[in-house]
Amino acid sequence: MEDEFVYKEAVAAEVIEVIGRTGVTGGIIQVRCKILGGKDTGRVLVRNVKGPVKVGDIIMLRETEREARPLDRRR
């Protein structure tokens, strides 16, 4: 019964670009995504995502205020 409201306050976003991998073992993927609903509809954010993701996937974001820091490209 509680599982029905898992995404009650989450907002859908579509992955429009996979930027690269981050994290010690590369387990986090940095993506550019477009917000599909809520007060920030149409806004493009850079976020870090855990798990497999590709362009066109829909991800659920708990909040749309923060953006991920750019990847360090020094290496």
Swiss-Prot record:
GO biological process: maturation of SSU-rRNA; ribosomal small subunit assembly; translation
Record Gene3D superfamilies: Nucleic acid-binding proteins (2.40.50.140)
Gene Ontology cellular-component annotations: cytosolic small ribosomal subunit
One Pfam family here: Ribosomal_S28e
InterPro entries the record matches: NA-bd_OB-fold, Ribosomal_eS28, Ribosomal_eS28_CS
GO MF annotation terms: structural constituent of ribosome
Nucleus as UniProt keyword: no
Keyword annotations from UniProtKB, A to Z: Ribonucleoprotein, Ribosomal protein
PANTHER family: 40S RIBOSOMAL PROTEIN S28, SMALL RIBOSOMAL SUBUNIT PROTEIN ES28
HAMAP family xref list: Ribosomal_eS28
Family label: Belongs to the eukaryotic ribosomal protein eS28 family.
UniProt name for this protein: Small ribosomal subunit protein eS28
The organism's taxonomic lineage, starting at the top: Archaea, Methanobacteriati, Methanobacteriota, Methanomada group, Methanococci
